[in-house]
């Protein structure tokens, strides 16, 4: 990273660190697709002799688990940034001029 070569590097993110794919897009979608496959697996398992009773889906429990995984991934990104001498700011920022970034607060 640029910080390792002496550049001043910072990231300002008002919501969560990790980007759209990790926080709002690809990762949540893949976890939802993965979780949705269990109902079909139960049906298939019954065809192979498993005595499994169909259950119900608990959206609250799923969302809790999803958020736990997103928290874990965000922690990985934050640790990588900290270990790379990148300052992080949990707020929105705007570019004021060619040499200045202004934090919202």
Predicted features and spans:
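Glycine-rich cofactor phosphate-binding loops and adjacent beta1-alpha1 units
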Residues: 1
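Glycine-rich flavin
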Residues: 4-7, 11-105
């Amino acid at each position: 990273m640029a910080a390792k070569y002496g550049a001043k590097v910072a990231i300002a993110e008002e919501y969560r660190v990790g980007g759209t794919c990790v926080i709002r897009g690809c990762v949540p979608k893949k976890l939802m697709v993965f979780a949705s496959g269990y109902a079909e697996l139960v049906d298939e398992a019954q065809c192979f002799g498993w005595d499994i009773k169909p259950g119900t889906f608990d959206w609250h429990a799923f969302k809790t688990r999803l958020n736990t995984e997103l928290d874990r991934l965000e922690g990985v990104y934050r640790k990588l940034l900290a270990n790379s001498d990148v300052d992080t700011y949990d707020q929105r920022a705007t570019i004021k001029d060619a040499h200045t970034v202004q934090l919202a607060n």
